């Protein structure tokens, strides 16, 4: 028996207005009440979670939230324009768990300023937040992005395939051995990515 969920991925769902979130959630919630689907999954940023938002998510049948944690190293967060402290991530995780919502974390390895050690320490810190599931994404340089500019200027060095595989292996193993189900490794290719 597979679970049937509606998913809002590919953006920061809780970054849109509460009113618009409610409209989307209410629409889907009607299908939950009719037994046609089991729940709602979504992804968002840790700094777009607060009590009011989580209460609304729970009210309308959200069963799983994946946070784009990326890193728990302050230097890496700053270098990637994530201007919030690690405590914000911890608080978002805690709040979701308190409301009984499955917690997913998305980690990126090889970001600007990241090292093997900082990526591994991020995974160790993430374990303290008790995620249920995780995704691990090696950083990709995509055309027409700030990261591509940094790469072309020699300000960022992408991981080699071998480095990315080895780093991912270490983090995957750490998470799985500690009871976190890693549900994806790597980015799902899309037409847009293939063109770039």
Question: Where does each model-flagged region fall?
Answer:
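Auxiliary Fe-S-binding modules of radical SAM enzymes
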Residues: 2, 146, 153-196
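Low-complexity, highly charged intrinsically disordered N-terminal segments
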Residues: 3-7
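Short loop/turn segments at strand-loop or loop-helix junctions that form parts
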Residues: 9-12, 186-188
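Conserved non-cysteine loop/helix-boundary elements of the Radical SAM core domain that shape
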Residues: 10-163
